[in-house]
Amino acid sequence: MSGRGFSRGGGGGFRGGARGGRGGGRGGFQQRDMGPPDTVLEIGSFQHDVESEMLCSLTAPTKIPYFNAPIYLQNKTQIGKVDEILGPINEVYFTVKMEQGMLASSFKKEDKVYISGEKLLPIERFLPKPKVAGGKVEKRGAQGGRGAPRGRGGAGSRGGRGGFSSRGGPGGRGGARGGAGGRGGFSSRGGGAPRGRGGFRGRGQ
């Protein structure tokens, strides 16, 4: 990926938001495609090809494309569909799985790609919701004390993991997941960098 990878900062809540967006995108494609739309909007610019797919940077900063949304040229010729969405909130990329007969390597850097306006979601759908201060948060924190009776929270109970064990009770487990969500960025497939694509992660589960 030419040195590009995920940013650990730059916005939170993308892990859960991206999955919700994927579900919405799939729901929109239950019906058969009815040909090109009346109008298309610029959605990205081509950066380079990756394993026969196009890697594009998002040029519509307030919109996120559906997964599997058709991608067009300006003349409404369909060239592929959105395959993956990658990166943090301030530097979003997406890949395009090519239609039969189309070659990602035939495009030039910064060539524009287009999408139907009906296949876009507002970026607010992927932003973290404000935390609500109150008794509920305190109750969840208190549950962490249950880890001690189970023997998982004590020092050295698992070969030196001590109180920092990631498996130390409901409170600890919830906290770990919350922290990971706050790192932000689209993370579709989970896990490391698949198929040799550098820092980018793959499809959603």
From Swiss-Prot:
Region (RGG-box 1): 4-28
Annotated stretches, region: RGG-box 2: 152-204
Entry's Gene Ontology molecular function annotations: box H/ACA snoRNA binding
Gene3D superfamilies associated with the record: Probable tRNA pseudouridine synthase domain
Major location category of this protein: nucleus
Localisation: Nucleus, Nucleolus
Function: Non-catalytic component of the H/ACA small nucleolar ribonucleoprotein (H/ACA snoRNP), which catalyzes pseudouridylation of rRNA and is required for ribosome biogenesis. This involves the isomerization of uridine such that the ribose is subsequently attached to C5, instead of the normal N1. Pseudouridine ('psi') residues may serve to stabilize the conformation of rRNAs. The H/ACA snoRNP complex also mediates pseudouridylation of other types of RNAs. The H/ACA snoRNP complex mediates pseudouridylation at position 93 in U2 snRNA.
The protein's name in its UniProt record: H/ACA ribonucleoprotein complex subunit GAR1
Organism: Cryptococcus neoformans var. neoformans serotype D (strain JEC21 / ATCC MYA-565) (Filobasidiella neoformans)
Organism lineage: Eukaryota, Fungi, Dikarya, Basidiomycota, Agaricomycotina
